[in-house]
Amino acid sequence: MTQSKTNLPRRRLLTQTLGLSVIAATAGRSAFAQDKPTIKIGFVDGWADSVATTNLAANIIKEKLGYPVELVPLAAGIMWQGVARGDIDCTLSAWLPVTHEAYLATYKDKVQILGANYPGAKIGLIVPEYVKPTSLDNLNASKADFDNRIVGIDAGAGVMKKTEEAIKTYGLEMRLQPSSGPAMAAELDRAIRAKKSIAVTGWIPHWMFAKYKLRFLADPKNVYGAEEHVDSVVNPGLKAKAPAVYAFLSKLSWKPEEIGAVMLSVENGAKPAAAADKWMADNPARVQGWLS
């Protein structure tokens, strides 16, 4: 059907008006963001907790505080270095006091620790519930069941260094196999499906504990240290650069079930930013509490 010629000017005017409105709204948002500096957040891609917390914070900083945000995936050591040098503004992925103790010793005079965004963290060797060993000091007796290996993550990571120390301290006749966070999780999944023995370097918080029945091997010699916390660490210049962001990060701290919901959503296929947005929508009072 052909359009009535008398309707064309009206439709053209409506289209032009809507177009101008969209342009004006977009320009307004762009101007809002351009008035403020970009906040660069370093994180460790492949660490489920790092991805979850970083995306939540980024969404809040963008949507509630109006700052543009750039997420920068880095290895842990480079991440700390970047905050110290000011190449990035902050990280929400500092495991203290044990896992990242070497980085803190190196950069403590050039960074500022705002406090824990997740208390109750822990690292160590993790096994499925069905395996026989219960402790690092009896792991050697079953080493053949584990193919004489421990599946690790990125070489140089804090938990990897502690595992190398554990191998020496407990006299473990097993090799530490570096890989990555996702590769380690994939190996764990395959082993559990086949009900094979496997030991992996791991930590809480992690979605693996929600998906599988796992436990830490006891560490009677305390190589891995006691309970840890995941801290927000910033470049000292952030307070002057973005005081609202600094204030928000100083208050940000969430609970195991909260971060667990976002991590599981991502593991089940959601985009990290979308999972964080959903959590924000479901928990407006918690978000407002960090901003007030």
Segment roles from a protein language model:
Residues 122-132, 228-242:
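A bilobed periplasmic-binding-protein/Venus flytrap-type ligand-binding module shared by bacterial periplasmic
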Residues 36-55, 76:
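Extracytoplasmic "Venus flytrap"
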Residues 92-107, 190-215:
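A ligand-binding cleft/hinge motif common to bilobed small-molecule-binding domains
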Residues 109-156:
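A conserved helix-loop-strand patch within extracytoplasmic ligand-binding domains
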Residues 1-27, 32:
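N-terminal secretory signal peptides
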Residues 57-66, 141-176:
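Ligand-binding cleft/hinge of the Venus flytrap
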Residues 47-48, 70-82, 176-187:
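Short helix-initiation/N-cap motifs at beta->coil->alpha
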Residues 52, 165-174, 178-195, 206, ...:
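An extracytoplasmic/periplasmic, membrane-proximal ligand-sensing/linker region
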